[in-house]
């Protein structure tokens, strides 16, 4: 019997990143989703194309050997698929993990295979698999929790690939940048060994990869979007053509780089090269990436462990500089009432209805004693007062 992977989430990252590399590694991919149209499209089309875009041109891969199940209407089928799978991955958004955990827990519990299934969450969040693992344990009966690890192994991952907004008529096909990084911790697999997926870079310690990626790629991307939006830019590449915005992005990245170099075994030179590569990637006009797409979901992006407060709080704790990160936070706070983005409307409501102190705690998760709190509070007040 061939290798089988269950991929929760049939969106652009699920199809254009995770499934592409599972397919190339020889897995049959079973997509699981709750969106009727997505499941039907995957069921009705036996292939789709992933086009990698770079300055050198385009390269297209055809993805085949997949199926799709609607977990809303066919939960028992999903349970059976997980019971006989080699790998379970997901790309659903960190806030959806709690909703997919119950069916994954049932699928793991139904396993009789001697080899445990590998569970890898592919989300833009630190410790996403740990989070999913916690929810799965909550949905596993107490007498089965101890033997859970005979049936499943859980490994955190760091993913990095820019997926721009897709053309409205693209269907299942995905345009995506050529560059990617997919790092997964190998220690949880112990003597059993990790799955055979050549695209994955298996590492002993994932934290440096996750923080370097989140605090460089995601921080710079969002900083560009928020400054770009404030200055009326439509595309990320256009925003970075503006020398002032580019300079502001580099100042933010100097601060996050100082944290990465101080905290992890990464040299200044290596981080400088990484920053150069990242800014070049997000400047790529061929990606046709919109400012509003990159800036969407500001509440999540302003949260405690995310791309701004995450590094700024650690810099504050170390007594290091974080002024430029606060400029980026201010721009994120100004990303309000953007059409099609519910979080930007909710952000506007929070800032309109709550006192600055309450809004700061609500948005960032910082407590009043934290050394970063006063600096964020100052920016919240400034935005609430409507001063530029």
Curated annotation (Swiss-Prot):
The keyword ATP-binding does not apply. SUPFAM superfamilies: 6-phosphogluconate dehydrogenase C-terminal domain-like, NAD(P)-binding Rossmann-fold domains. It comes from the Eukaryota. The keyword NAD applies. Signal peptide: none annotated. GO terms for molecular function: mannitol-1-phosphate 5-dehydrogenase activity; NAD binding. Keywords: NAD, Oxidoreductase. NAD(+) binds at residues 5-16. GO terms for biological process: mannitol catabolic process; mannitol metabolic process; response to heat; response to oxidative stress. Its EC number is 1.1.1.17. One of its GO terms (cellular component) is cytosol. It catalyses: D-mannitol 1-phosphate + NAD(+) = beta-D-fructose 6-phosphate + NADH + H(+). InterPro entries: 6-PGluconate_DH-like_C_sf, 6PGD_dom2, Mannitol_1_phos_5_DH, Mannitol_DH, Mannitol_DH_C, Mannitol_DH_N, NAD(P)-bd_dom_sf. Induction: Strongly induced at the onset of sporulation. The active site is at 213. NCBIfam families: PRK02318.1-3 (NF002647), PRK02318.2-5 (NF002652). Catalyzes the NAD(H)-dependent interconversion of D-fructose 6-phosphate and D-mannitol 1-phosphate in the mannitol metabolic pathway. Has a strong preference for NADH over NADPH. Required for protection of conidiospores against exogenous stresses such as high temperatures and an oxidative environment. Belongs to the mannitol dehydrogenase family. Monomer. This is Mannitol-1-phosphate 5-dehydrogenase. It comes from Aspergillus niger.
């Amino acid at each position: 019997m061939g290798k089988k992977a269950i991929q929760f989430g049939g969106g652009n990252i699920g199809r254009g990143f995770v499934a592409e590399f599972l397919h190339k590694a020889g897995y049959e991919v079973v997509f699981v989703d709750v969106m009727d149209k997505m499941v039907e499209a995957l069921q009705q089309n036996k292939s789709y194309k992933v086009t990698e875009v770079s300055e050198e041109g385009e390269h297209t891969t055809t993805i085949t050997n997949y199926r799709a199940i609607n977990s809303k209407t066919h939960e028992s089928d999903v349970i059976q698929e997980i019971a006989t799978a080699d790998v379970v991955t997901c790309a659903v958004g960190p806030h959806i993990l709690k909703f997919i955990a119950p069916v994954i827990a049932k699928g793991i519990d139904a396993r009789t295979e001697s080899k445990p299934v590998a569970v890898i969450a592919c989300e833009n969040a630190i410790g996403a698999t740990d989070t999913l693992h916690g929810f799965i344990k909550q949905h596993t009966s107490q007498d089965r929790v101890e033997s859970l690890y005979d049936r499943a192994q859980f490994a955190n991952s760091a993913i990095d690939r820019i997926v721009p907004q897709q053309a409205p008529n693209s269907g299942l096909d995905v345009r995506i940048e050529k560059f990617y990084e997919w790092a997964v911790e190998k220690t949880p697999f112990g003597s059993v060994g990790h799955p055979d997926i050549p695209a994955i870079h298996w590492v002993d310690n994932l934290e440096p990869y996750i923080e370097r990626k989140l605090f460089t790629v995601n921080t710079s991307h969002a900083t560009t979007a928020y400054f770009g939006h404030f200055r009326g830019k439509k595309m990320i590449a256009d925003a970075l053509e503006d020398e002032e915005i580019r300079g502001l992005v580099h100042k933010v990245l100097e601060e996050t780089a100082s944290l990465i170099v101080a905290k992890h075994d990464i040299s200044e030179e290596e981080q400088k090269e990484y920053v150069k590569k990242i800014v070049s990637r997000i400047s790529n006009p061929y990606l046709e990436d919109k400012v509003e797409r990159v800036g969407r979901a500001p509440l999540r992006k302003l949260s405690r462990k995310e791309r701004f407060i995450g590094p700024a709080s650690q810099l504050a704790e170390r007594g290091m500089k974080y002024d430029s990160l606060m400029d980026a936070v201010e721009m994120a706070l100004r990303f309000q009432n953007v059409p099609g983005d519910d979080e930007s409307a909710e952000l506007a409501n929070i800032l309109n209805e709550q006192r600055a102190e309450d809004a700061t705690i609500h948005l960032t998760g910082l407590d009043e004693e934290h050394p970063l709190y006063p600096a964020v509070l100052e920016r919240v007040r400034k935005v609430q007062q409507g001063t530029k």
